[in-house]
């Protein structure tokens, strides 16, 4: 009962802060944003670490989501006035794999201690000017936005700009890798089919080709994370020897 009351109080605080700081926005959109923010990951640690912080920072995250075009990456770092060694990192970007893992590993490698992390994934509806008008399961273009709010400590006196830039760079790499991943999986399937067509002409190599096909199937079935690959063409050389040439693209 006590836990439920605290959750209700926290939800009311966040929604009240959102409506106070974002009065021009749809109450329904703010209410749904508040619900999803609190339900994705328990917010107890954030509230315990910085009492009264959640409502104000929720409004900051909402603004970042709104100010970041749906297909771009937004990063903002806010240092806490009363505890300058602590800060809240906000990010907004198209949903993909490895976002949270990348941020956690990066902050840990830089020597920062994560105190709390919230990670809502939202479907966002916007008007012609890009303003958020609705949040739900299937609104807007249907694409999902992944947002994070991370409270951490250990920030140096002048580290905001460099950290923001590095977070944006890392998330850009994550997006490239995960976007290319699907294309590389499709290419693995294409290569497998190309090998199938070779079996007729190279019947003495069928066992070897079959083994390669099985390996490609194993990769495609989620046993490997594609980060990149190269293709080569084997061409006749001027001296009669075959040459290997890297294929562009």
Task: Indicate where each model-derived feature is located.
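Extended charged low-complexity segments that act as oligomerization/scaffolding linkers
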Residues: 125-152
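Amphipathic alpha-helical segments
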Residues: 99-111
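Glycine-rich phosphate/pyrophosphate-binding loops
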Residues: 111-125
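Catalytic micro-motifs at enzyme active sites that drive phosphoryl/nucleotidyl and oxygen chemistry
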Residues: 77-81, 103, 132-140
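Charge-rich interaction surfaces and accessory domains that mediate macromolecular binding and assembly
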Residues: 1-93, 105-108, 120, 149, ...
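Glycine-rich loops and low-complexity Gly/Arg-rich segments
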Residues: 114-117, 140, 175-177
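Flexible loop/turn segments at secondary-structure boundaries
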Residues: 97-98, 124-126, 157-159
